A protein has these predicted regions:
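Extracellular interaction modules
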Residues: 1-6
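Surface-exposed, extracytoplasmic segments of Gram-negative outer-membrane nutrient-acquisition systems
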Residues: 7-8, 12-36, 44, 53-115
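Short, well-structured alpha-helical interface segments that form or flank functional binding sites
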Residues: 36-40, 47, 119
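Short alpha-helical segments and helix-capping/turn motifs at coil-helix boundaries
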Residues: 38-41, 126-128
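Membrane-interface anchoring segments and C-terminal beta-barrel signals
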Residues: 46, 67-69, 79, 88-191
Length: 191
């Protein structure tokens, strides 16, 4: 059983008894990591050369753990449909068959490093040279990409998570869609 104490993840090997709705034996609790990143990284830069301009923004977070709940759910061998192929890797020492009472959700096997580095935006533009014009001052054509790539060892959809819910820090629930990658082609005209 795993539990959150602030932003720290703890695990218990067994539950001996319940007393006043609290687990009474803390002897088996182990520190497994922190749900909050130790380091946040942000970097943006822009370059200009003649009529070309290039700008980018990168973000990253390092030194934290994520509980991969979608993987735990879809690797649960007690359901007979919609399972991941990786269920055959047997996180419980060769035990392949689970009953519906055996949950894989909150076990340390699904706790992963959440470190990542993302290219959140990159834009390449070209200012089209104009001969003197009364009406148009500038024309710039550009191409832009958002969420171009993410370098991570995390097996889930996206290691970048919201830290707004204190009770869910570091847990990647099954309630989100993958981040959208978008490409934009544009033309700026100044009059």
């Amino acid at each position: 059983l795993i539990g959150l104490v602030g932003s720290e993840m703890c695990i218990r090997d067994r539950i001996e008894e319940f007393t006043d709705n609290m687990l009474s034996n803390d002897d088996y609790r182990q520190y497994l990591g922190n749900a909050l990143p130790k380091l946040y990284l942000g970097w943006n830069n822009s370059f200009r050369y003649k009529n070309f301009d290039l700008s980018f923004q990168m973000t990253g977070q390092f030194g934290f753990k994520i509980l991969n709940e979608p993987r735990a759910y879809y690797e649960n061998n007690s359901i007979a449909y919609n399972r991941l192929k990786s269920v055959q890797k047997a996180p419980y020492g060769g035990q392949y068959t689970l009953s519906t009472a055996q949950k894989q959700t909150f076990v340390s096997y699904y706790l992963e490093d959440g470190d990542f580095l993302k290219m959140t935006n990159i834009t390449l533009g070209y200012n089209i040279p104009l001969k003197s014009s009364k009406f148009v001052k500038n024309i710039r054509a550009y191409v832009s990409a958002d969420n171009l790539f993410c370098i991570t060892g995390y097996d889930g959809l996206d290691p970048e998570m919201s830290n707004s819910d204190i009770w869910s820090l570091g847990i990647d629930w099954r309630d989100k869609y993958p981040s959208t990658r978008s490409f934009t082609f544009g033309l700026n005209v100044s009059f």
